[in-house]
């Protein structure tokens, strides 16, 4: 071993994407290494691969190779330890760029000129420097903006089931999201383990909506190495932190699919022969996910914010599966997609009853959205919950045997799903959402609107005479 360059010739062996070395006393966890095989035929130089130290045991190390290891002979491999951890060159010039999962250009353009090169394994925000999340990010989706408001600095995951249009919803939010008041806003989008069709569908959607110039795209493909999948969200967050806290932008980070990330984490852990935890996932998965999600927030004294909207697929539609279960402990609510609503053709199929934004009160209401936001949302939620109960009862006794009040609630539940939740791919402002909510509530007498203060009811314009009877006929006027 060369003590200056720390170059090692020869390796113990290879197991899948892992390269094992010995006689490396000064290696560091997370250190970047360069790997070169024997020269190819016709005198051509050997291809150089890169990797990262992921395990240490005395003077032995395990290196995760970022490229494939096929054709690499362990005995002839030459490994150079750089002494550096993984870093990413970041700048405001990354806006409008399409990058691979490691932050390298994937759009055929030169690399952005870096303003800084921070380590991608950044720490969570210092709790003593955190500012309370406030103000909302308008996604244009009524079930989120109206019922589960996304607040700047929040981490709000989307829980989906296999086959549901979670990717379509993620792309729609990237295209529609904005902040009020003309403040600078950007989106960082990171896809992990995306198949070919989905990979291009995202890019086509962003280009068609004309939002690529305010977006940084990180795309990790399904065929890329698992270690790259583990680095993709960290590269995206490193870029987002620079835009938010160095340039004062309000940044929304959309991560999809976190389940692909966790599968890669399990694959690497099994390759390292670690003792598995629940469902075969490593016991430190909670801590690992926390190092990603806890990078969201606001910093006291700085104008920007970093908001996260991670999307994950629940294996077997199981909300108690380790991935959604642990994610729910770290984050501040959840948006749940429903297979039943999707079967009925409702898009986006967001089930508002199990969905929750724990920080909604910090971004909705007087001075944030509208004075009537929380009361209207609470009243809609209450009627919809009762309507769902009536729907289950009607499946047993028959709709014809329901009373007038039950029929009105049943009609409201149907109209709520079709008119408010099922908006399709259109953009709705928060004003449009609240007015749609008021139209649904117009089918009830004022005395039934117990969640709405009297002053707000008096401030509303007179309702049409047909309004009180609108829901009794099963439709919303």
From Swiss-Prot:
SUPFAM superfamilies named among the record's database cross-references: C-terminal domain of alpha and beta subunits of F1 ATP synthase, P-loop containing nucleoside triphosphate hydrolases
Highest taxon in the source lineage: Bacteria
Protein name: V-type ATP synthase beta chain
Alphabetically ordered keywords of this record: ATP synthesis, Hydrogen ion transport, Ion transport, Transport
Gene name of this polypeptide: atpB
One GO BP annotation of this record: proton motive force-driven plasma membrane ATP synthesis
Record Pfam families: ATP-synt_ab (PF00006), ATP-synt_ab_N (PF02874), ATP-synt_VA_C (PF22919)
GO molecular function: ATP binding; proton-transporting ATP synthase activity, rotational mechanism
Organism placement in taxonomy: Bacteria, Pseudomonadati, Myxococcota, Myxococcia, Myxococcales
Family: Belongs to the ATPase alpha/beta chains family.
Protein function: Produces ATP from ADP in the presence of a proton gradient across the membrane. The V-type beta chain is a regulatory subunit.
């Amino acid at each position: 071993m060369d003590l200056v360059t720390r170059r090692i010739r020869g390796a113990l062996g290879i197991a899948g994407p892992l390269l094992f070395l010995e006689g490396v006393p000064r290696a560091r966890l997370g250190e970047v290494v360069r790997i070169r095989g024997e020269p190819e035929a016709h005198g051509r130089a050997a291809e150089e691969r890169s990797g990262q130290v992921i395990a240490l045991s005395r003077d032995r190390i395990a290196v995760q190779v970022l490229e494939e290891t096929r054709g690499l002979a362990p005995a002839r491999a030459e490994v150079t330890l750089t002494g550096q951890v993984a870093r990413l060159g970041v700048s405001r010039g990354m806006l409008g760029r399409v990058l691979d999962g490691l932050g390298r250009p994937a759009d055929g353009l030169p690399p952005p000129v870096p303003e800084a090169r921070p380590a991608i394994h950044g720490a969570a925000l210092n709790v003593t420097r955190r500012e309370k999340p406030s103000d909302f990010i308008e996604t244009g989706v009524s079930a989120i903006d109206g019922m589960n408001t996304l607040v700047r600095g929040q981490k709000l995951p989307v829980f989906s089931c296999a086959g549901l249009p979670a990717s379509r919803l993620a792309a729609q939010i990237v295209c529609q999201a904005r902040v009020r008041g003309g403040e600078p806003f950007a989106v960082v989008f990171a896809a992990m383990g995306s198949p070919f069709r989905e990979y291009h569908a995202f890019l086509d959607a962003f280009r068609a909506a004309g939002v690529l110039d305010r977006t940084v795209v990180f795309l990790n493909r399904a065929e890329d190495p698992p270690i790259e999948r583990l680095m993709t969200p960290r590269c995206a967050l490193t870029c987002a932190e620079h835009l938010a806290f160095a340039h004062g932008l309000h940044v929304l980070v959309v991560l999809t699919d976190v389940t692909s990330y966790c599968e890669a984490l399990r694959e690497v852990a099994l390759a390292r022969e670690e003792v598995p935890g629940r469902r075969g996932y490593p016991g430190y998965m909670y801590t690992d996910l926390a190092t990603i999600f806890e990078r969201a927030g606001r910093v006291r004294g700085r104008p920007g914010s970093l908001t996260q909207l991670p999307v994950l697929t629940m294996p077997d539609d199981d909300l108690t599966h380790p991935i959604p279960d642990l994610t729910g402990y770290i984050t501040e609510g959840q948006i749940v997609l429903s297979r039943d609503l999707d079967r009925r053709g409702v898009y986006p199929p967001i089930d508002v009853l199990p969905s929750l934004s724990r920080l909604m009160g910090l971004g909705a209401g007087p001075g944030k959205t509208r004075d009537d936001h929380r009361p209207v949302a609470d009243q809609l939620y209450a009627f919809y919950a009762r309507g769902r109960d009536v729907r289950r009862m009607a499946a047993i006794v028959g709709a014809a045997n329901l009373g007038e009040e039950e029929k009105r609630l049943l009609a409201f539940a149907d109209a709520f799903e079709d008119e408010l939740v099922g908006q399709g791919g259109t953009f709705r402002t928060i004003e449009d959402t609240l007015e749609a909510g008021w139209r649904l509530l117009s089918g009830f007498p004022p005395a039934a609107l117990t969640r709405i203060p009297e002053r707000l009811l008096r401030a509303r314009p007179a309702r049409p005479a047909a309004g009180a009877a609108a829901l009794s006929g099963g439709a919303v006027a």
